[in-house]
C-alpha cells in the first residue's frame, strides 16, 4: 500500500512560528515565502546568534566548508539541515556530509524529503554536550 504524505515541509523541518531561521545557499523562492509566512526572523547568509533552524544548501564536498562555523550560531536545541540533491542526480554523498558534521561536533538525527529533487539531513548538538539548564522553579 502506498502511503500518502501530507505533512507540510515546514512542519517536517520543525520550523514553528516566531523561530529564528537562516537560509544559506538555498535558492528557492517558495521556501522563502513559506518561512516568511511563519516567522519574521529570517536571514539569508550568516545566521544570527541563537538561530533555531539553519537550512544549508550543499551540492559538492567543498560546499560543506562553512558547516563547522554554523554550529556555534545555533541554539543548544537548534538544528542545521543540510539540503542536497538526492537519487541518481546526487553530487554529494551522505557519508561526506556526515564526516564534516561529526568533525564539527554534530550528530544526525533525521532525514526529510525537501523536494522532489532534494533531501535534507538534520544535524544537532548532542544532548550530552548542550549547556545544562537549571531545574524548573530554580534560579542560578
Predicted feature residues:
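Conserved beta-strand segments of the P-loop GTPase G domain that flank and frequently precede/overlap
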Residues: 24-25, 54-59, 82-85
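N-terminal, charge-rich interaction modules
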Residues: 1-34
Amino acid at each position: 500500500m502506498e502511503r500518502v504524505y501530507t505533512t507540510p515541509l515546514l512542519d517536517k523541518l520543525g520550523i514553528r512560528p516566531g523561530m529564528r531561521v537562516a537560509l544559506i545557499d538555498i535558492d528557492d523562492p517558495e521556501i522563502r515565502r513559506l518561512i516568511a509566512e511563519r516567522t519574521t526572523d529570517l536571514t539569508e547568509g550568516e545566521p544570527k546568534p541563537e538561530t533555531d533552524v539553519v537550512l544549508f544548501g550543499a551540492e559538492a564536498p567543498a560546499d560543506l566548508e562553512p558547516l563547522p562555523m554554523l554550529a556555534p550560531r545555533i541554539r543548544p536545541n537548534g538544528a542545521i539541515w543540510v539540503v542536497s540533491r538526492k537519487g541518481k542526480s546526487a553530487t554529494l554523498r551522505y557519508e561526506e556530509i556526515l564526516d564534516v558534521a561529526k568533525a564539527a561536533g554534530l550528530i544526525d538525527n533525521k532525514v526529510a524529503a525537501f523536494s522532489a529533487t532534494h533531501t535534507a539531513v538534520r544535524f544537532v548538538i548532542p544532548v550530552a554536550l548542550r549547556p545544562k539548564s537549571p531545574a524548573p522553579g530554580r534560579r542560578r
